[in-house]
């Protein structure tokens, strides 16, 4: 069975978050190998969105606020420790944020627009 395959577009903010995760693990835990594994695991989870981008939860509904004025924002838990927020635009999944799941990300978005 053929599935439609979506393109994944990483925002500079998400790339920066991946870099910070890698640096933190490599420096604070002193393990480059653990840092590589964690980033690879996150990217593997993100790649699932190529086949089924609707898998994530409705962020706009959960937050009670539309984060993107033009598209529905969705969220997906990654590697147990992170959440990626994204929109689906035609055949592209646009990754907007990569956040620690233990952070108070809901509070962050109560006052901040995606375009800030």
Identify the function of each model-found stretch:
Residues 37, 54-58, 116:
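Juxtamembrane/interface motifs at transmembrane-helix termini
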């Amino acid at each position: 069975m053929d599935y439609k395959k979506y393109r994944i577009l990483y925002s500079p903010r998400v790339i920066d978050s991946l870099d910070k995760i890698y640096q933190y693990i490599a420096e604070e835990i002193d393990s480059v190998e653990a840092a590589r594994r964690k980033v690879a695991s996150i990217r593997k989870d993100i790649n699932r969105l190529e086949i089924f981008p609707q898998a994530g939860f409705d962020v706009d509904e959960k937050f009670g606020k539309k984060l993107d004025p033009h598209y529905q924002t969705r969220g997906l838990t990654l590697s147990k420790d992170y959440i990626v927020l994204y929109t689906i635009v035609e055949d592209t999944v646009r990754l907007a944020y990569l956040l620690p799941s233990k952070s108070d990300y809901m509070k962050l978005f109560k006052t901040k627009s995606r375009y800030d």
